[in-house]
């Protein structure tokens, strides 16, 4: 059970701008330099998708053809542009206006240092990126096209890191636009923040969110073969510290939990879904509220999952899982539960009754246990119990439906070890230090209308989510080490004004 590589077969096209004015020899040098640069970037190991160099762009027709092909190719997740020489920006207009893939402008050059003693006009004519990129940047800004700008010599490690982070955001956007979310049941009764406009979500994020009757899941449960259940149980035994009682007197409960996982996975795969959500108020004839199965959605399958009908967080977890593929850490549903208000040691503890995923990293081998659950009205559910592994500069991200648009809200946090054993707490959890402080972070979070459900990512941090929000054209409010409550409130007011004016459809 291994998550499919979301970067397999995916490409980022590299378009280099120039013009015929400079002659064949100059254009030959442009092509040689561009190939050297792309080869170097591909060999850094920091960019998870392959960068593919396309023929030098020298005309309006060539640019449009390039952009149309990139937009139509399902394997292309993004486009990088760079102008080696001066490239008149009017020739980019028609192409840029038909581009539907994420755009990154790389402001770089082939040479690292100015050749002080030998530089002449031939060199100047060939190496004009410093003003070629400004010309290109002007037209992109004039057209109102959002893009990421990365500046630096192509051999600078920071350049490859930023390109790699952006490539991950592109993959997250690709996953979002190909996502189907399976809802078993509806939203938890009377809860506000987990509601949302599913039609608007498909317009904005490309994700198709639909409901399947819980009775269909029950039918899938009844159809599961014992061999599939036993295979899943063997996987449990290999990866977790299984309570001996579950292999003896409570084996039937373990079998049921594994069978529920198999049923959910079978339904998801049969319908091409990559995120799911259930609701403890709507379980039909299921024997248990699913626990260990949903916990494994992000870690084993790379899927999103959330609880209580909260499809918005399930979408975020899937996006986070894709963006973080191949990195240490992962993505999981998280819910704020309790504060530690000790002066100088302020902490937030997040958890959920069953569904927090070990994908975020665990301090010790997760324990597979069975405990009573006071809600849902079903048999005692089997769940993984662990504490999240410490991680610097992790993030918690929420999505709220604020009437005419969606708002993403993010807090940068440091996950830390719990200060006690938590031996009486029969569920998975994580403890973190919010930035800039617990009081400021919570005040800002509440002011922005952030959800109590979040997606925690320990694999990718702030920049990946900022890149994703820019690509999606969605508001993102950020709480970090530099945030003050007064400044945040003012920025939020300006952001609300901008997004309300900019989201008139």
From Swiss-Prot:
Keywords: Arabinose catabolism, Carbohydrate metabolism, Isomerase, Manganese, Metal-binding. It catalyses: beta-L-arabinopyranose = L-ribulose. GO terms for biological process: L-arabinose catabolic process to xylulose 5-phosphate. It is an enzyme of class 5 (isomerase). One of its GO terms (molecular function) is manganese ion binding. Pathway: Carbohydrate degradation; L-arabinose degradation via L-ribulose; D-xylulose 5-phosphate from L-arabinose (bacterial route): step 1/3. Signal peptide: none annotated. Transmembrane segments: none annotated. One of its GO terms (cellular component) is cytosol. The keyword Acetylation does not apply. Mn(2+) binds at residues 308, 335, 352, 453. It comes from the Bacteria. InterPro entries: Ara_Isoase_C (IPR024664), AraA_central (IPR055390), AraA_N (IPR055389), AraA_N_sf (IPR038583), Fuc/Ara_isomerase_C (IPR004216), Fucose_isomerase_N/cen_sf (IPR009015), Lara_isomerase (IPR003762). Its EC number is 5.3.1.4. Binds 1 Mn(2+) ion per subunit. Its cofactor is Mn(2+). The keyword Isomerase applies. HAMAP family: Arabinose_Isome. Catalyzes the conversion of L-arabinose to L-ribulose. Belongs to the arabinose isomerase family. This is L-arabinose isomerase. It comes from Bifidobacterium longum (strain NCC 2705). The gene is araA.
């Amino acid at each position: 059970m291994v998550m499919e590589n979301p970067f397999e077969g995916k490409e980022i096209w590299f378009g280099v701008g120039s013009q015929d004015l400079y002659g064949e020899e100059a254009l030959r040098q442009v092509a040689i330099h561009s190939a050297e640069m792309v080869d170097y970037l591909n060999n850094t190991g920091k960019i998870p998708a392959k960068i593919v160099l396309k023929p030098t762009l020298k005309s309006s027709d060539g640019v449009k053809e390039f952009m149309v092909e990139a937009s139509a190719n399902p394997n292309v997740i993004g486009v990088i542009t760079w102008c080696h020489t001066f490239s008149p920006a009017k020739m980019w207009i028609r192409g840029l206006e038909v581009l539907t893939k994420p755009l990154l402008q790389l402001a770089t050059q082939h040479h690292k240092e100015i050749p002080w003693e030998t530089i002449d006009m031939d060199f100047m004519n060939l190496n004009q990126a410093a003003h070629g990129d400004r010309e290109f940047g002007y037209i992109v800004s004039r057209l109102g096209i959002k893009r990421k700008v990365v500046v630096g010599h192509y051999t600078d490690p920071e350049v490859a890191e930023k390109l790699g982070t952006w490539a991950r955001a592109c993959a997250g956007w690709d996953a979002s636009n190909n996502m189907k979310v399976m809802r078993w049941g509806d939203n938890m009764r009377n809860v506000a923040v987990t509601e949302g406009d599913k039609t608007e979500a498909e317009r904005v994020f490309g994700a198709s969110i639909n409901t399947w009757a819980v009775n269909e899941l029950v039918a899938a449960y009844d159809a599961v073969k014992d061999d599939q259940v036993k295979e899943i149980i063997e996987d449990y035994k290999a990866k977790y510290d299984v309570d001996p009682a579950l292999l003896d007197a409570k084996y039937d409960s373990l079998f049921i939990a594994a069978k529920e996982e198999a049923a959910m996975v079978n339904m998801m795969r049969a319908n091409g879904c990559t995120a799911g959500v259930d609701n403890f108020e709507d379980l039909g004839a299921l024997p248990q509220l699913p626990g260990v199965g949903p916990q494994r959605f992000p870690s084993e399958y790379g899927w999103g999952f959330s609880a209580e009908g909260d499809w918005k967080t399930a979408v975020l977890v899937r996006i986070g899982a894709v963006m973080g593929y191949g990195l240490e850490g992962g993505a999981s549903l998280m819910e704020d539960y309790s504060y530690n208000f000790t002066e100088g040691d302020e902490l937030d503890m997040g958890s959920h009754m069953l569904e927090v995923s070990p994908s975020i990293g665990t301090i010790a081998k997760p324990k597979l246990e069975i405990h009573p659950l006071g809600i849902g009205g079903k048999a005692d559910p089997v769940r993984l119990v662990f504490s999240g592994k410490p991680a610097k500069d992790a993030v918690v991200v929420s999505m709220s439906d604020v009437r005419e648009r969606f708002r993403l809200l993010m807090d940068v946090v440091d996950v830390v070890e719990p200060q006690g054993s938590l031996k009486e707490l029969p569920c998975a959890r994580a403890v973190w230090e919010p930035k800039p402080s617990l009081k400021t972070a919570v005040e800002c979070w509440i002011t922005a209308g952030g959800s109590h459900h979040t997606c925690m990512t320990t694999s990718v941090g702030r920049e990946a989510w900022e890149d994703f929000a820019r690509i999606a054209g969605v508001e993102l409010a950020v709480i970090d080490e530099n945030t003050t409550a007064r400044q945040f409130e003012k920025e939020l007011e300006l952001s609300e004004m901008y997004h309300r004016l900019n989201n008139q459809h």
